[in-house]
């Protein structure tokens, strides 16, 4: 795909507006997982190093649009950036009518979702954003699937619209994994909801040699095989669809599972066959035999696409399945690409970031790209590159 890249431009003295993905978890005013900020830092540093007048912004959480709410302020991100950068960093709350930025200074523009019209890709708001800059840098792959004012609309009106290094790297890595993957290719789709990922499973079934399902998705497949899943999270209305996928694809369904009688961090885990799940139990992880079976499959893979954990890894007693799978991916010689918020949290927890070939910052965008959908922000950048 042909887009203008930020790395090809001279940014010295230019007003540069970077739309990053700084949507990080915050607790008590502190950033609790900095993966997305870390991923955005090289782009920010490159613009500062070139002597640009740099503005960066993002959404954070889901505030009521058009209203300021301290709970969703980018202030914790600003404090984090102050620790990491030697350049001056400041937060600007009201910026739609203009903002002064010095060369080598970083101005963080407050949460874009505080601006009315952001989510609807409002043209007036988009033009106000565009008026702030000479160069618009789209670097938030995680929101590239949404046509919003700060990810899409601004790019139509800015003098120059380009892809930041992070976005460009995402597109290159995903292209490598999906267009001509080294084989065998294994795709892992986990997490809680089947409905949101069934189209992904369908698309992946056409390109992957082996599909692996985990989490609530696996529970639906266990039910499709006629097993009782008790009180487990699963989607009864999608059992027939799971049956269809089982007949058309090679999908290993867990043979053993870890169950509990309550969904809680302190719940004790019982390892048992899928044949023995009781009516008052819920499946919260795959069992050891199932996890080892998946580890063997992953050992022989040449390309691995990983989206979603195979169990409730946030609870220590139901972590083992995801840990075995995560370590198998880390130990594999395959080109591995991982995406999705829960997946990133698991990678952090098990300390394997340096052993994954490429970690995507996108969740929904990652899945939509996998499905072969057009990402509005990318389409806009391609359009602007033609002019």
Curated annotation (Swiss-Prot):
GO biological process: gluconeogenesis; glycolytic process
SUPFAM superfamilies (UniProt xref): Phosphoglycerate kinase
EC main group: transferase
GO molecular function: ADP binding; ATP binding; phosphoglycerate kinase activity
Residues that bind substrate: 21-23, 36, 59-62, 113, 146
Location(s), subcellular: Cytoplasm
Keyword Transferase attached: yes
Binding site for ATP: 197, 314, 340-343
Reactions catalysed, as given in the entry: (2R)-3-phosphoglycerate + ATP = (2R)-3-phospho-glyceroyl phosphate + ADP
Pathway(s) of this molecule: Carbohydrate degradation; glycolysis; pyruvate from D-glyceraldehyde 3-phosphate: step 2/5
Quaternary structure and partners: Monomer.
HAMAP family reported for this sequence: Phosphoglyc_kinase
Family: Belongs to the phosphoglycerate kinase family.
Protein name, per record: Phosphoglycerate kinase
Natural source organism: Shigella sonnei (strain Ss046)
């Amino acid at each position: 795909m042909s887009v203008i890249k930020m790395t090809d431009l001279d940014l010295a003295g230019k007003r540069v507006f970077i739309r990053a993905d700084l949507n990080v978890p915050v607790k008590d005013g502190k950033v609790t997982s900095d993966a997305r900020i870390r991923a955005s830092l090289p782009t920010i540093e490159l613009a500062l190093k070139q002597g640009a007048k740099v503005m960066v912004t993002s959404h954070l959480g889901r505030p009521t649009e058009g209203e300021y709410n301290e709970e969703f302020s980018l202030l914790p991100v600003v404090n984090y950036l102050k620790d990491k950068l030697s350049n001056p960093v400041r937060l600007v709350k009201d910026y739609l009518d203009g903002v002064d930025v010095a060369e080598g200074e970083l101005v963080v523009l407050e949460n874009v979702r505080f601006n009315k019209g952001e989510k609807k890709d409002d043209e007036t708001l988009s033009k106000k954003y565009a008026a702030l800059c000479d160069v618009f840098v789209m670097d938030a792959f995680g929101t590239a699937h949404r046509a919003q004012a700060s990810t899409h609309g601004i790019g139509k009106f800015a003098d120059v619209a380009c892809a930041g290094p992070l976005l460009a790297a995402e597109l290159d890595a995903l292209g490598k994994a999906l267009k001509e993957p080294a084989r065998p290719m294994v795709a892992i789709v986990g997490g809680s909801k089947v409905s949101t990922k069934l189209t992904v499973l369908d698309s992946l079934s056409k390109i992957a040699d082996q599909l692996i399902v985990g989490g609530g998705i696996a529970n639906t497949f266990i039910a499709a095989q006629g097993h009782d899943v008790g009180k487990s999270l699963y989607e009864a209305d999608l059992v027939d669809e799971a049956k269809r996928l089982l007949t058309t694809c090679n999908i290993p369904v867990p043979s053993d599972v870890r169950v509990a009688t309550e969904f809680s961090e302190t719940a004790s885990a019982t390892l048992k066959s899928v044949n023995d799940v009781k009516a008052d139990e819920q499946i919260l992880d795959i069992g050891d035999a199932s996890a080892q079976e998946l580890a063997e499959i992953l050992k022989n893979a040449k390309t691995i696409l990983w989206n979603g954990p195979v169990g409730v890894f946030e609870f220590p007693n139901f972590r083992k399945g995801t840990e075995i799978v995560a370590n198998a991916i880390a130990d594999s010689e395959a080109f591995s690409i991982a995406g999705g918020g829960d997946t990133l949290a698991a990678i952090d927890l098990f300390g394997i970031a340096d052993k994954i070939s490429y970690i995507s910052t996108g969740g929904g965008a990652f899945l939509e790209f996998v499905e072969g959908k057009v990402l509005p922000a990318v389409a806009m950048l391609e359009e602007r590159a033609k002019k």
